[in-house]
């Protein structure tokens, strides 16, 4: 059953708050600032309040009545709010920004967990342990293969849908199409600098540096979003009257 506007708006607010919590864990090196997001809606949203009650906030976002503004915050409490902000849609938030932050957070957690498992395994493993639970060499090779050319090459991951392929196949495919070859998701806003780096188990020691690079790519993606100027159709978000 479709959520009401009020319920879907509460869910969106909660997701943005969670995304802000995740983003606060990744301050930039040169100034210590970190990405934060807030809702902004058009004054016309009040005029359409009655209609909005029967839809969800995604519909309001598609009509341009609701946007997400991105700014930077600092540990001293200062922000670039209303001074230097970029805008994005609810769809881009759920398709790119939120999944990217979740992937960064989950990836670092996975790295720490795998390192702890490796330490325990080396310390307490038995000499007669068999390889029954290990993947075969053929399975490992298939895991590293590009899904298009079936060659074992360094792969990249599309930030919009998380499908992976080797960089050569990506370039060849992108020259002919603007959609993912696996799910047909749009790649119109995805450039080579936005791609994530696919890592295998042999590269576990370098994962922290790679996640740092992935954070850099996420920030580059944000920097390409439209800059908010003096747009009268975008005003600070406040709860709509009941």
Swiss-Prot record:
Cell compartments where the protein resides: Cytoplasm, Cytosol
Pfam families reported in the protein's UniProt record: zf-C3HC4_3
GO aspect biological process, one term: response to salt stress
Effects seen without this gene: No visible phenotype under normal growth conditions, but mutant seeds are insensitive to germination inhibition by abscisic acid (ABA).
Swiss-Prot/TrEMBL induction comment: Induced by salt stress, cold stress, drought stress and abscisic acid (ABA).
Function: Possesses E3 ubiquitin-protein ligase activity in vitro when associated with the E2 enzyme UBC8 in vitro. Plays combinatory roles with AIRP1 in the positive regulation of the abscisic acid-mediated drought stress response. Plays a positive role in abscisic acid- and high salinity-regulated seed germination through the ubiquitin-proteasome-dependent down-regulation of ATP1/SDIRIP1.
Protein name according to UniProt: E3 ubiquitin-protein ligase AIRP2
Lineage of the organism: Eukaryota, Viridiplantae, Streptophyta, Embryophyta, Tracheophyta
Gene: AIRP2
